[in-house]
Amino acid sequence: MEANAYSRLWFETFLRTQSPEWTAREVAFVARQAPQPAYRTVLDVCCGEGRHAIPLAERGYDVTGLDRDGAALFAARERAADLGVAARFVEGDMRDLAASVAGPFDVCVCLWQSFGYFDAATNEDILRQMGDLLRPGGRLILDIYHPGFYAAHQGERTVERNGRAITISERLNANHLTVDIDYGPDAAPDRMEWELYTPGAIQTIAARHGLRTVLACTLCDETQLPTPDMIRMQLVFERML
């Protein structure tokens, strides 16, 4: 099966069952780390159906969302139109950002573990491209998995979403995470793969490309340092002058 294909069933099962309260927390974190009016233009890389892009636009940001999934972008445009929100949604490949969007932006966000899909060199180049699309002093905000969490939490588990029992198998090999999702006999499975980065590793990569670390935290809480006890961490970088 193709990894990281994100089936329609995946969107229905995981994206659309995300807590509105958690989405609001993520968006509020972005707004604190990139406050208006100093930061206004936002590029949301791997925006999906606009879960973050639309509420950021509702806050007054000038938002461009980029994703490779045309169906997800169609849903994002429909939802934005229904809400009367002005946001642009562009189809494109995160490996070649300049082919689809033109900077500079004040902010680039890549949230909900949407970074690390490729090999180490390609991932680093994507981070470089995101930084290059920022104005001097612009900020890049990443929300990514902590490899230490998965080092201690591998194996198989069953969850229930939308009345469906789903088996999730998670395996970490070095820093490569593979997640297999079995929806049952009536649906094709999904596979997700990522390269994961420790806080220090991703900060070192960012520094190589002129991005200084402003903040590393977890739970979208500036007072909480990243820890292997928590699945996610947020990092804020600033493009140096």
Model-derived features with residue positions:
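Conserved SAM/SAH-binding loop
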Residues: 49
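Class I SAM-dependent methyltransferase SAM/SAH-binding core
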Residues: 53-96
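A short acidic, Gly/Pro-enriched loop at the edge of an enzyme's catalytic core
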Residues: 99-107
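A short glycine-rich, Lys/Arg-flanked "PGG" loop and its adjoining helix->strand segment in the class I
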Residues: 124-136
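C-terminal lobe and adjacent flexible extensions of AdoMet/dcAdoMet transferase-like proteins
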Residues: 201, 205-241
